[in-house]
Amino acid sequence: MLLFEKVGVENTEKALELALSSAKERGLDVVIATTGGGTVPVVLELAKKLGYEGKIVAVTHAFGSREKGKNILEPEKMQEFRDKGVTVVTAAHALSGAERGLSKKFSGIYPVEIVANTLKMLGQGTKVCVEIAMMALDSGAIDYGKQIIAVGGSGRGADTVCRLTPEYTSDLMGTKIHEILCKPSLEE
């Protein structure tokens, strides 16, 4: 496992190289997190450079997550990515979604949020990898029961890559993390 010195966007290119190389070697789909779309052009460029011809799925926030009726990822960018062969998934966060609404209203914490925060003990990106993999599976963008390479981050960019077999959110504890290829150190 490669351990980056710190979290952040400066790890993006190396994380994506690891993700695509591993996916190519193993014949796996790649699922990446994207908020505003900045990581997608980088992964497409590196995929071409490295000869990765497999499926790329970009998972972004649900509509209304920041502003009602809108998505953070602009519709033009979504279409541009689709035109380049990327499957774009917009969905509620698998490890918060409706539970976050309950915890805000009733000032508590609920089981799925506990799972999310437990995964964050390995870093924000590890939580994101598990979450986007389940979101992609729930949407039908990836095949059930197959390993994938998931790429997450801690804010902007990518800094965590996991090889995992996701489960549907209705059976989230069945998700298996087989390998963490890279992640940032959590040293302060």
PLM feature spans:
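Conserved mixed alpha/beta catalytic, RNA-binding, or beta-rich assembly cores of soluble enzyme
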Residues: 1-188
